[in-house]
């Protein structure tokens, strides 16, 4: 049984140590905690709790709150217990006004990174960023010639199907739904429910991008270092326009220590949330950022901008220079031109009735004081042969990755579904002969059914395998190669001669040669 009075004192010490609880607020906060835990009085004598000050994450305390809520009929199940624990940490966390004031002060006095450190660490220590759960994700790098892919098996976020994402994008806004979606500003401090994750402990800071009101928060899933989400304060759909480029660079002006990018505004080639305009960024050098130019080009209209087609798997253009305004102008021209472009000789079909072309732009401030804009060209057309998308992961790779390839993965950081962790172990058992496998008898309901073809091929090539580590290495190699092929699938202009000529034809329409 959890001692509630003892728990209250531990939470007070924790909040004073990590969540900026002031001495003058200690009695007030203790009474708030007593009320929440349904206690009438605190401990008469407070024991030594210095060990609390050594904590690096709040997991133990969060779990104690959950246990206490179940033991004392405050919560009837795990979901309610989680919501309650998050609400307690929300109570312990500074109010949004205080957070914004401190963030602005630190940014002005100590710089952008100090301000970001403050908000990030607060979000870890109030359990919004669930650092322990994130640390369980599997992560490795794959070097492929001049390029490197970062591959993670995500154990904290469920896999989404493209068809579900399309339904969400087209769904009418329900006036009764509150908050309207997971990105709306009304999430800040929201208790949550059985269908909505707890957001009592969420804190954001306000930004102005393109003259509009936006907010910044950190991602609870944190796919990379200081992974942040930047969202419009109004519930408005994703859109890809010239103004998108301007807003990305407005963000870079505020936080030059981060990159920032926008998912595209169309299903299949966009992110999982299309009904609320948002960007993603953070303090991480993405694999695509390390890619070298394949070709260097020039613009007649913007001679001060360095232009290159990247030596990368998908169709990416890099613009760099010291003049942010000319980069924004040229970037806007590329976005507008691509949205209206067609070239049926390479399968790029676009029409006024149904637009298929869009972009994935990413802005950065480089160490040599140059501005950088990378634009990945995207197309979401479907056919009978490829009903999930011509420039999407082809069906033979869906056993590894079926979700749309959004901003993060298009830059070479793969987020693979958590189901793969167990399935890799099971496939290793089969390859080593420790588990039976008969492709003719495997049922569609079997989790390994989706891997039937891959397992058969791997067994044929490695018939007498008895080294488990070797088996795991073989499976991982297959996953690595699949990730490369998926990115190649997303390229609207393939890297062969035909694709390269087609790419340059498009750029010629902008007088880029």
Positions of the model-derived regions?
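Hydrophobic faces of well-ordered beta-strands that scaffold small-molecule active sites
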Residues: 216, 260, 277-279
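Secondary-structure-rich domain cores
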Residues: 211, 220-223, 227-265
